[in-house]
């Protein structure tokens, strides 16, 4: 069902890939990943590609932010790559992204964001999943926010 839904979404939004022209190829490919659409209480209502979730008026979807602290209590912040499509070159938290509409990340909200965080910590910071899977993540709550980058790109997320 997911594959049919993705193919239908691509046909219905055939002009969206044009919005990615001129962007880094690997970043553009990640924009095809399926985010988890949620209602205002973080209840799952469907899935949609990252590009559709972040383009135009945006669509509310589940996300996460990881705050990493060292033994002295200092938080790691990172400057987002200038190749990022949304919010390039901006200073941000240690790691942020989205759980995807895949079995390991789309069932339980908290466990899903932990699995997604481990995946992205490896991809973005090079911290192996074999290391992060042993960590104890502390879920400190959720909040909803909207933040526009420019006329085209926006965030609208329930962030864990």
Locations of regions flagged by a protein language model:
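Cytosolic, low-complexity regulatory segments enriched in Ser/Pro/Gly with interspersed Lys/Arg
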Residues: 1-21
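Acidic, metal-coordinating catalytic segment for phosphate/diphosphate chemistry
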Residues: 19-72, 80
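Sterically constrained small-residue positions within well-ordered secondary structures
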Residues: 26-28, 57, 84, 130, ...
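Active-site-adjacent beta-strand/loop module that shapes the phosphate/pyrophosphate-binding cleft
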Residues: 42, 72, 135-160
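Conserved Nudix-box catalytic region and its N-terminal flanking loop in Nudix hydrolases
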Residues: 51-127
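Short secondary-structure junctions
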Residues: 125-135
């Amino acid at each position: 069902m997911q594959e049919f839904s993705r193919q239908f979404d691509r046909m219905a939004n055939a002009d969206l890939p044009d919005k990615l022209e001129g962007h880094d190829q690997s970043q553009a490919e990640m924009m095809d990943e399926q985010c988890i659409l949620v209602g205002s209480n973080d209840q799952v209502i469907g899935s949609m590609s990252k590009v559709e979730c972040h383009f135009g008026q945006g669509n509310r979807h589940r996300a996460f932010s990881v705050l990493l602290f060292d033994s002295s209590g200092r938080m790691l912040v990172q400057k987002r790559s200038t190749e990022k499509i949304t919010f390039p070159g901006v200073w941000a938290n240690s790691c942020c992204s989205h759980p995807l509409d895949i079995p390991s990340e789309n069932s339980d909200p908290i466990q899903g964001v932990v699995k997604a965080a481990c995946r992205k910590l490896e991809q973005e910071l090079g911290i192996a999943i074999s290391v992060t899977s042993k960590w104890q993540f502390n879920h400190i709550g959720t909040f909803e926010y909207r933040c526009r980058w420019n006329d085209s790109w926006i965030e609208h997320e329930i962030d864990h």
